[in-house]
Regions:
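Surface-exposed loop/turn positions within long extracellular repeat scaffolds
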Residues: 2-8, 17-78, 83-98, 114-123, ...
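Parallel beta-helix/beta-solenoid
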Residues: 11-16, 105, 124-132
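Short aromatic-glycine motifs in intrinsically disordered, low-complexity regions
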Residues: 62, 107-110
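Extracellular/lumenal glycan-associated surfaces
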Residues: 185, 203-212
Length: 250
């Protein structure tokens, strides 16, 4: 319908309930999803200024717009799944420790700087924003994983002990002219089914710790950029393993 939710209304979805909201709303009360419930949001303004609490195995699915988890849109005590589908995108924060993320094709999730133990799956693109990022959870996506940085500034990305990342491709630094350090910790596994590029301009270092394993179909050590001589990325095998597929090393 054409109605809307206004005022200090609290929206509660009982256990197992399902609701789709496509209209913009202006309510300011809480939105609470009970265990097993699902709320599908098809309008960037559908939740008004509400804070959403995900309980149990509830699902909040966003099909359009840009979601910002850096604010208070998801309660930090949430334990369900945030699903991005359609053309939705979002930026999240490490404070949401209990949330699982599911990325549909053509969607993008950005991790702000911090340490993450979350489970992230799907077919979309995952981005680690500027700053130090540590992954202690499990990532399994068929899209690209990209690490962002500031031009001319060093950046660090770490896959924690026992953690795993599977992605269709990986770029350890998308920007140019700054050293990138990728740390694969003890017993961590990185599995890139396409091309693993440590840094676009070759100014990168990958450290693979004891028991750590990196698998890639193709390893790209990087190219010279803007006339600056770069020998390509450096890989340090500190008791770890590197296995390449038919694409070899370029």
């Amino acid at each position: 319908g054409d109605g809307s939710i206004t005022g200090d209304t609290t929206l509660n979805l009982l256990d197992g309930a399902s609701l789709t909201v496509n209209n913009a709303n202006s309510y300011a009360g809480d939105t609470v999803l009970g265990d097993g419930s699902k709320l599908v949001v098809g309008n960037a303004g559908a939740l008004g200024t509400s804070t959403v609490l995900l309980q149990g195995d509830s699902v909040l699915e966003l099909t359009t717009g840009t979601w910002n988890g850096l604010g208070t849109r998801l309660n930090v005590n949430s334990s369900g799944t945030l699903k991005l589908s359609g053309n939705a995108s979002g930026t999240t924060t490490a404070a949401l420790t209990g949330v699982r993320y599911e990325l549909g094709a053509n969607t993008t999730l950005t991790l702000s700087a911090g340490t993450y133990g979350n489970t992230i799956t799907g077919a979309g693109t995952l981005i680690s924003a500027v700053g130090t990022n540590v992954l202690n959870g499990n990532v399994d996506i068929t899209g690209e994983y990209r690490v962002l940085a500031t031009n001319g500034t060093a950046c660090t990305w770490t896959l924690g002990a026992g953690a795993s990342v599977t992605a269709g491709s990986f770029i350890g630094r998308y920007e140019y002219n700054g050293t990138t350090t990728l740390n694969i910790s003890r017993d961590a596994v990185m599995n890139i089914t396409g091309t693993l590029r440590i840094a676009r301009d070759g100014k990168g270092v990958m450290n693979i710790g004891s028991g750590g394993m990196v698998l890639a179909q193709t390893l790209d050590l990087g190219q010279n950029w803007d006339g600056v001589s770069a020998k390509g990325a450096t890989i340090n095998l500190n008791g770890g393993s590197l296995l390449l597929g038919s694409g070899g090393m370029t």
